[in-house]
């Protein structure tokens, strides 16, 4: 059983898994907390039982992508793929 909103939790988890950035999942009070990691970039995306989504972490390409995931879900659009930075 998930503490976060079931449909949104499922969407976020699928996005993180399909882009290969899901590192960890934790159930916290009133939310599901996902940890995403790509190379040295690490960020969190929390899905609350109300449907609210919160992105946490230092500004990085990963955080920017998680913010796009958030706005895409809110707008009912498809979630964009994560495009890692080119060195």
Give a label for each model feature.
Residues 42-65:
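Intrinsically disordered, low-complexity regulatory segments enriched in Ser/Thr/Pro
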Residues 61-87:
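Non-catalytic propeptide/linker segments at domain boundaries
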Residues 27-32, 48, 78-87:
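Acidic (Asp/Glu) carboxylate-rich active-site/surface patches
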Residues 1-43, 64-72:
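Short Lys/Arg-enriched alpha/beta "domain-start" segment
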